[in-house]
UniProtKB/Swiss-Prot annotation:
The modification N6-(pyridoxal phosphate)lysine is found at residue 101. Gene3D superfamilies: 1.10.287.3440, 1.20.58.930, Alanine racemase, Lyase, Ornithine Decarboxylase, Chain A, domain 1. Its cofactor is Mg(2+); pyridoxal 5'-phosphate. The keyword Lyase applies. Catalyzes the biosynthesis of agmatine from arginine. GO terms for biological process: arginine catabolic process; putrescine biosynthetic process from arginine; spermidine biosynthetic process. Pathway: Amine and polyamine biosynthesis; agmatine biosynthesis; agmatine from L-arginine: step 1/1. This is Biosynthetic arginine decarboxylase.
Amino acid sequence: MAETAASPAHKVYNIAHWSDGYISVNGQGEVEICPDRGRSDARINLPALTRSLAEAGVPLPVLIRFTDILHDRVNKLCNAFNKVTQEQGYRGRYTAVYPIKVNQQRRVVEELLSAEPAASANQVGLEAGSKPELMAVLALAKQAGSVIVCNGYKDREYIRLALIGQKLGHRVFIVVEKQSELPLILEEAKKLGISPLIGVRARLATIGKGNWQNTGGEKSKFGLSASQVLDVVDTLKQAGALGTLQLLHFHLGSQIANIRDIQTGLRECARFYTELHAMGAPIGTVDIGGGLGVDYEGTRSRSSCSMNYSVFEYAYNVVHVLQSECDRQGIPHPDLISESGRALTAHHSVLVTNVIDREYPDNREPTEPAAEAPAPLQDLWRDLESLQDEDSPRSLAEIYHDILHAMADVHAQFAHGLLSLQERAQAETLYVRCCRMLRAELDSANRAHREIIDELNEKLAEKLFVNFSLFQSLPDVWGIDQIFPVMPINGLNRSLNRRAVIQDITCDSDGRIDQYVDGQGIETTLPLPEHDPESPLLMGFFMTGAYQEILGDMHNLFGDTHSVDVKLDQQGQYQVGEPITGDTVAKVLRYVNFEPANLLEAYRQKFRHSGLSEELQQTLLAELSSGLEGYTYLEEG
C-alpha cells in the first residue's frame, strides 16, 4: 500500500517493512488500518474507531481484531502455493492447516475457515494438539473432506474422537508422535470398522535457529527417530495395514528467520519421503509443519524476530525441493500441508490503550557548586561549562566519558558518607543537563557518536506508564524477549523528537518493554511526538494475533481486556461486531477461589463493627460492590 508522504512516521517506526501493507499514517498523524489490500481505499481510522468504541461503552484497553486481515493472510499463503505449483508443474495439492493453539478464539478460527476463495477450494484445514482442541475442531470444520491433523500426545479417547471425525466425513490424519500410540490407533480403528489415516512425525536433524529452535531437530519433544520410523513401517506391514500410512510430518521449528534453514530441512524431509515410498508406504501427503516466519521488526534479516524471505519464496522452496527429489526418484508428487499459524494470525489484531502518566528526567536549572564542594561536583560543573563554550578544545566523547566518571565518584562518595543528599541531588541535576546538551550536539551520521547517542537516549528517556499488563497482553515480551511493533496511533504529525520506555501498570519491575522497532533497527527507547495535553496519546501494540491471547496470565489479577471484531462491508465501511467484555474484578477473583458474595459479606461484617453511620456504611458498601463488577484495568486517566 502506498505511503502517505505527509507523515515522517512511516520511516521513524519502519512501518512499511513490518506492517505488510496493513498500516499507514494519514496527513493528520493518525494510524489507519487497511484490512483488505485488494481495496486500498477502504481504510479504518484507528483513533476514530477507538473513540467510537469508548462512546459505545467499550473503554480502553481494548483488543481490536480485523477479520479481513485474517482472510487476506489465508489467501496470500494459498495463492503463493497455487502460483508456484502451477508455474512449476507440481502435481500435488496445497492445504493451509491452521493449528488452533496459536489463537483458539472461536471467531478467529471461523474467520480463517471462511476466507474466500481458499475456503470454497477446500484449501483450509485445522490442526489440534489436545482433546479439547480436537473437540472444538470437529465442531468448526465445515466441509466434508476438510483436512484435520491430530498432533500431540494421544490416549485412547483422543484417538477415538479423531476416528469419529473421520466417520463424519473429514480427512483426519492421526500423526504418530510416540510409538505407543500406533497399537491404540489400530485397535480403535478396528472397533469402529474404519481404515485410519495414519501419519508419522519424523524427527529431523535440521533445526531452524531462533527462540523456538528446540521445537524442531533432534532435541524436539515430539517425533520419531529414523529407526523408530522403520519400526512403525514394520508394525504396519505385519498388521497388513501399511496402506493406512498416508502422511509424513516434520517440524523445523517456529518463526524460522533464515530461508537456508528451511531449505536444508526440506531436503532432509524429501529424503524421508522418497525412502518410505520405496519401502511401499503409500504416503500421499507431506505436512511440512510450522516455521514460516513473520517480520515483527521489519529488518528483513536473520534476527529471531524477523525473516529474510517472502511468503512466495517460502512456497517456491517447499515445492522446488520436494518436486526435484520426487522427479529424480520417479515417484508421485505428494499433496502439501503447512501449519503456518503465526503467519496467518499475527497481523490481524492490535491492542489499543491510553497513557496514564509520564515521568521525565530531572530538568531543573543547575546551580554552580560552592567553592568547597566535593571534587566530582566541580568536575561536572566544568564539563557543563565546556559544553556551553563553542571554542572548547574538548571532544564531545571526552566530555561524555568524564561525566560518567564523575557520577560514579558521586555515587561512591555518597555511599561512604562523603557527600550529603543535597550535594548528590545537585550532581544529578548537573549530570542530566550535561546529557541533554551532549545529545543535542551529537550527530548520528558520525559513526563514533552512535553508541553514545543510544546510551543518552536511554538515560534521557521518559517513562511512559501505559494502561495494560505486559504479562496478560504481551507475555512473549517478558518470557522470550519477543519484539512487537509499538507506536502511538495519534499525534504523529508532531515532531518525533522525544524518547520513552514503556512501563505497564503491574507491580512488577519486569513489566516494561526494553526493545522497540524504529527506522534504525531495534532500539532501547521508543520515539514519541511532542506532548500535547489537549491531545493525549493512544498507544498501539501491533501484530499481537499469534499466541499472546492464550498465553497471557493474570499477574496482579489483571484479566482479559475487552475485545471487538471489525470487518469491512461491501461499501468499504467498517462494521463492529458484538464486543466481548473483558474480565471484571469479580471474575478474576473467582479464578483464585475468592467468591465475591463471601467478600461482600466480609465487608458487611467489618462495617457493622466500624462505628460508622448506617448511611455511610451503605454508601461505602455500595462502592465496594460496584468495584467488584468493575474492569480490572484503570478506568480513568
